[in-house]
Amino acid sequence: TNAKKKVLPQKLNKAITLYKVEYIKDGNVVGYAYEVNADNLGLTEKELVAGKQNLTDNLREHHKRYFCTVPVIRMELDIGIDFLINIISANDNYVGSYQISKDDCIN
């Protein structure tokens, strides 16, 4: 992929670390990667991967509320910039991904 990783990294809590990934090829998408540590959630890696849909759905709903209400981010959505979020485990297992776009802010 034509991506460049800008390592914030930012610990959101003891279980989740945020990385910002800037996609050079497509200027309309800003990507973020979340690394989730199963142990710090009180789960095994197997339990985390088994419950990945629930975690992905919960994070997506959180981001919809957040991105659509923070004025500077909402402005980016309104001009056609999308946000792509990928979630991986600390052991590099795929957990989920989703995109937030302008249409997600329409009730």
Question: Which stretches of residues belong to each language-model region?
Answer:
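Low-complexity, compositionally biased segments
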Residues: K5, D57-R60, N107
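Mature extracytoplasmic domains of secretory-pathway proteins
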Residues: E22-R74
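A mature extracytoplasmic/lumenal domain signature
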Residues: Y34-N40, I87-N91, I100, D104
